[in-house]
Amino acid sequence: MAQAFETNFWKDEQLRKVWDDIVPGEPRKTIPYVLTLEAIQRYCRAVGDLHPLYFDEAYARKSRYGGLIAPPSIHILLMFSCTPADDWMRSPGTINAGQSWSYNIPARPGDTITLQARALDKFIKKERLFVIHDNVFFNQHGEVICSGRGWTIRPK
């Protein structure tokens, strides 16, 4: 069974950092996540990506990857799986204003994923509160799976 994470973004909302509390350069608190085959396949079904690299062991074994992998977009699931319920990124009303990702190696079933994340900058534009943030996902061997920079508009 895949590890569960809190999907009620309103729960403990008052405990999260608000705009004034976010310090550029300060690391965000993160938690390791064991990526299971079940989680990969549930994610793939949810987004409609049924490629055999994610479902068919025999097919995947013959591929250049030598086994089942997760799709590159799995970082979306990992972002929330690797952050605790009180992380400011989970604040209700947060808007994704854009992102740019680089993919190095695929995540695999059984990988223990860790996230290094921090706010890089914050600014106000047209009365909106923006945060630029940096995220790097690693597997249990310290290899970078993917890294990215995102822009969010904060609710407060």
Which ranges hold each PLM region?
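HotDog/MaoC-like acyl-thioester-processing domains
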Residues: M1-D20, Y103-K156
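Hot-dog-fold acyl-thioester-processing enzymes
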Residues: A2-N96
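Short alpha-helix capping/helix-loop boundary micro-motifs
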Residues: G98-S102
